[in-house]
Amino acid sequence: MPSWREKHEKIVQSKILVIGAGGIGCELLKNLAVTGFRKVHVIDLDTIDISNLNRQFLFRKEHVSSSKAATATQVVKQFCPQIELTFDHDSIFEKKYNMEFFQAYDIVLNALDNRAARNYVNRMCHAANRPLIDSGSGGYFGQVSVIMRGKTECYECVDKPVQQTTYPGCTIRNTPSEHIHCTVWAKHVFNQLFGEVDIDDDVSPDMDAVDPDNTEAVTTEKEKEAMKEEPAPVGTRQWAESVDYDAAKVFDKLFLHDIEYLCKMEHLWKQRKRPSPLEFHTASSTGGEPQSLCDAQRDDTSIWTLSTCAKVFSTCIQELLEQIRAEPDVKLAFDKDHAIIMSFVAACANIRAKIFGIPMKSQFDIKAMAGNIIPAIASTNAIVAGIIVTEAVRVIEGSTVICNSSIATTQSNPRGRIFGGDATNPPNPRCFVCSEKREVFIYVNPDTMTVGGLCEKVLKQKLNMLAPDVMDSATSRIIVSSDGDTDDLLPKKLAEVSIEDGAILSCDDFQQEMEIKLFIKKGDRLAGDDFEVARSEKEPEPDDRKRKADGSEEPEAKRQKVEEKDDKNGNEAVAEITETMA
């Protein structure tokens, strides 16, 4: 059994690669330094935002807009000058971060906030045969997973379900049933009043929309005739300008007149509760004395009263109007970290929720939904980072006691603990990343799917390849080239390039050192670039693994998209737990 000196020497000599210098990354770098690790390299593409300062404790106000990796390196060296800490302000997807790069390190520690980057690091560590410790946190929950080639399941052995991020436009405008519907609508209201107007983000009632819960229900001719007697709803921006953005009148337009108009669509309310129109003066006197905007913003974890929501709505309109008039050529854009904008959206969402009988939420919760993120909690990040280092020490020492940890800091388990460990699972024999038999069966319609659709939708989006090269195994013909030599084939249907039922495609991604055999199975019921993925030849996976091409939606089912912040902001709102760095 090695002595503590021998163990310490292993820690000192080990070369550690840290990917991510955000919420978990800051805590992790500090922990590595004080534990005794001396050879550490950190990579992060992000820069410091003022909203990071409440939980990413290596950063200060003067660091805003600076590189996270560079600043974290500088600060850690100040309190631990003996550490050999280097950094790259770069994207992990750059070609220089190849298998040889990863092989230069003894262990890789993930503090990433998005699935694409985690997939890439997982594959590179597998190719380089380097241990990977993956981590994530979301609110009061967190997880740490140890991944070792041939011993444990990899990051992609289990499919990660994605939370819905699109909602039917008719649900948003006519029949919200969840607070997220009200939050999306409130963001649209902000854009209609102060931002870039998108005709797809109209907030007025949609008279011709079909009830999503009762597809047979339509607006009857009698209802249409009755509604014709009423003036049709006008555009939100047009209405606001006509009344000089009078807060009470804008309120009544959105929450009284539009709701009264909506109530005339009798077919919508046969199986659901009718909304209750709300007047500004009524709202202002409901729920006691309203809080001021400043007090309400400080109290962002409590649920505002209706009178406070009306007060915040009115105050924010005046504040935002002043900003617009000060810079008339500048259109405001939704920003979850802009205090006035976020308070306006929160007030709007809660007022609409009240009208439709939906429980109201705190601004903290609404911000999470509006930003399409899970808020980061500093204490959760600290616990996760501590567990990462504990597991890293075990791996370096060659310990056989390796486990995956889950954390819930809101309540303890029956043993009085806030986190627990689970035994690691063996590799999934059907995983196309870490199994010896890297095979994927897909169901497509060769008569409708294009070569470009196969490359973009299947290989890049579903299988997360970066620059695939595809060859027909039967004829050795290259149908997709990462160099662009076959771009003329991209518009062609698979059948036109002799890719039919039973075809086997050899797909190589040299950047990730990855090769997959893709078996083509014909699915006559599929259209366009639709496809289904199966892990085996016997049967396709469940329907929830189906991925449709973006343009294949029927017009009447057109969906209004929640703002999808890119991975830079840590906004992959998914059922798996991911860290929020931004």
From Swiss-Prot:
A single GO molecular function term of this UniProt record: transferase activity
Q: Which residues bind Zn(2+)?
A: C154, C157, C431, C434
Compositional bias segments (type: Basic and acidic residues): 219-231, 531-570
Q: What family does the entry list?
A: Belongs to the ubiquitin-activating E1 family.
Q: Describe its function.
A: The dimeric enzyme acts as an E1 ligase for smo-1. It mediates ATP-dependent activation of smo-1 and formation of a thioester with a conserved cysteine residue on uba-2.
Q: What is its EC number?
A: 2.3.2.-
A Pfam family that this protein carries is UAE_UbL
Compositional bias (Acidic residues): 204-214
Instruction: Indicate what this protein is called per its UniProt record.
Output: SUMO-activating enzyme subunit uba-2
Q: Does the entry feature the keyword rRNA processing, yes or no? A: no
Q: Which residues act catalytically here?
A: C170 (glycyl thioester intermediate)
Q: Which InterPro entries match?
A: ThiF/MoeB/HesA, ThiF_NAD_FAD-bd, UAE_UbL_dom, Ub-E1_IAD_1, Ub_act_enz_dom_a_sf, Uba2, Ubiquitin-activating_enz, UBQ-activ_enz_E1_Cys_AS
